[in-house]
Amino acid sequence: MCGACEPRHFFCNQAVNIMFCRHSLSFCLGLLGVLMTTQVDAGISLSATRLVFDGKHKEAGITVRNNGEDVLIQSWVDSDVPGATSVPFAVTPPLARVAGNEQQLLRVIYEGTGMPVDKESVVWLNVQEIPQATKTQNTLQLAVRQRIKVFFRPSGLNANSYLAPTELLWRLIDRAGKTVLTINNPGLFHVSMADVKLQSGQSVEQPIDSMMIAPGEQKEFVIKQFSSSSTPHISFMSINDYGAQDRYTTQLSNSSPVNASLIKSSP
């Protein structure tokens, strides 16, 4: 997400696995190239592009809808943290058969311990179709996985996630003759951003396509085209709890960090 944007269905990470192929090697490689550059049309869809887990409750739910033929789905939670072998979450049911044009509620359950209690954390919910066996031997079967972020918010956080984008600290600094944009997140929530644009004079640069900045994290980006003759402005889209995008902007300074303000909220 990319790490930042909350993808709608196939904008999420997907795993396309070649299960069985009885054709010649050259044909398989050619077909694989087409599959990797073509959006796979899955039969299942999720009711949200992100899942916010309120730590005041023992579980959070999301609905899987099957728009195709009968399918078996497998669901689990994992982490992108290096070295993490498991996370204190379970999904029930972990395996479910969903009939065509029907839906299945997935319950993500927290074990009660193991996650930070002073800030928001992120894990990933995976929902994967398991291809059904076919009678045809010369068959290429695909396992399509959809992956969305689960934002776990422990109970007792004295902060408002809606204000998180306005708490980011933006600053331009000069480092060895280069202009560097710094972004600091002093808050308790992750901020997912997209379409980050820096305007200085007649120049408009997009130093970041999309990203997510964690609580307490700072990111830096070198600005290639910068005009010091005018006041620079930054604008960006931030994804809220409902998966919609709100636009923020601020006037930058190289003397002190500044906050952005909301200028357009999604309906």
Model-predicted segments: where are they?
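Beta-sheet-dominated interaction scaffolds and their linkers
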Residues: 42-63, 160-175
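Asparagine-centered strand-capping/turn motif at beta-strand->loop junctions
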Residues: 64-67, 181-187
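Intrinsically disordered, low-complexity Pro/Gly/Ser/Thr-rich segments with frequent PxxP/GP/PP motifs
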Residues: 87-115, 203-229
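Terminal connector regions
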Residues: 113-157, 230-267
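Surface-exposed binding patches on compact interaction domains or structured appendages
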Residues: 45, 63-109, 194, 201
